[in-house]
Amino acid sequence: VRERMGFDDGVPSALRDMGVASVFFEPPTHAPDLTFDLVFLGEMNRLLPFVPLLQSIHNAGRTLLLVGDVPEVLRAQLPASVSCTGRVPYTQVPQQLRRARFGLNLVSNIEPYNQQTSTKLLEYCAVGLPVVSNDYAWVRYFAAHYQGNFHLLRDDPSSWQFSFGEALEAYPYVVPDVRELVWPKLLAKLAIWKHLHIVPE
């Protein structure tokens, strides 16, 4: 980033990755109502290339909840087993995620997306959801670094119905501990504070 933007003035700086809001770590106020098999959170336009995969979820007899605004171009292609919440206040997102048994992480396997931190995956982990994801570079790095085990889907469409069928239940998921990624802790670790002679609270 420094090289591409021409930041060569020697001003102290720090690179900060994405974190998770504290609200995602708060225990639920009541027992979750597990209405759905899978939940997807994020920018819905990015789901358009994955419509065939969403159809495989439907064909496997599974239900999916989309949390967020769904554009009409996508809504028109959704199978009947997909439900949409519409826009949800940020503080209510954890409650919506807990309505499902698995978090669905879908990211186009092209740069720069396949190198970027998936905020939704961090939030799935924070609320304790096992994760199903397409296979790409960052998700493999994160799973190895944080000792997680995610159900990574193959690129072969003919395998998807099985992956969302009996394999969905049988996979040995491990949800990694991401408490160190809560925003206050993440920000407190930035080296920039030393240059500014500030001690984070």
Predicted features, each with a name:
Residues 79-80, 119, 140-155:
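Acidic, glycine-centered active-site loop in nucleotide-sugar glycosyltransferases
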Residues 19-26, 31-77, 83-98:
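Conserved catalytic-core segment of nucleotide-activated headgroup transferases in glycan assembly
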Residues 1-3, 67-74, 135-138:
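Short, polar loop motifs at secondary-structure junctions
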Residues 154-200:
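A charged, aromatic-enriched C-terminal amphipathic alpha-helix characteristic of glycosyltransferases
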Residues 101, 126-128:
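A short alpha->beta transition loop at the rim of the catalytic pocket in nucleotide-sugar-dependent
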Residues 61, 128-129:
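Glycine-centered short loops/turns at secondary-structure junctions
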Residues 1-27:
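Donor nucleotide-sugar binding/catalytic pocket of nucleotide-sugar-dependent glycosyltransferases
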Residues 45-48, 91, 105-123, 133-142:
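Nucleotide-sugar-dependent
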